[in-house]
Every structure is written in structure tokens, then in C-alpha cells.
């Protein structure tokens, strides 16, 4: 919890210069580097990563 207060972001993305406080944030960020779009609209052809 203290990392939030002191501004430390020790977790780094291996693909870019993104840093964060915890691994769950990195897991979410890593979707931005993926070419997969797993969430699709049932009514149209729209798809998203998130």
C-alpha cells in the first residue's frame, strides 16, 4: 500500500516504458500489446481488448 504514497512503480512492462504498482495493472496493460480482441458485440461486428 505504501507504494501508492511514495510514487514508486517497480513493475515494468517488457514491451514499452509503462510502469505500475502491481502485477494486476500490468496484466491489464499487456492487453494493449496483443492483437487479439476477445470481447465481441453480439449485435454487430465490434470487438475490443478490454
Swiss-Prot record:
Any one GO BP annotation for this protein: segmentation
For molecular function, the Gene Ontology terms on record are: DNA binding; zinc ion binding
Q: Keyword set for this entry?
A: Developmental protein, DNA-binding, Gap protein, Metal-binding, Nucleus, Repeat, Zinc, Zinc-finger
Compartment(s): Nucleus
Which Pfam family, giving just one, matches this sequence?
zf-C2H2
Q: Which Gene3D superfamilies match?
A: Classic Zinc Finger
Zn finger (C2H2-type) ranges are 1-5, 11-33, 39-50
Keyword DNA-binding listed: yes
- Name the protein family: Belongs to the hunchback C2H2-type zinc-finger protein family.
Protein's name in the database: Protein hunchback
Q: What organism does this protein naturally occur in?
A: Bradysia coprophila
Amino acid at each position: 500500500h505504501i507504494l501508492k504514497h511514495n510514487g514508486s512503480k517497480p513493475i515494468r512492462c517488457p514491451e514499452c516504458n509503462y510502469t505500475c504498482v502491481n502485477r494486476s495493472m500490468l496484466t491489464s496493460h499487456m492487453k494493449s500489446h496483443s492483437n487479439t480482441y476477445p470481447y465481441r458485440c453480439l449485435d454487430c461486428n465490434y470487438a475490443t481488448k478490454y
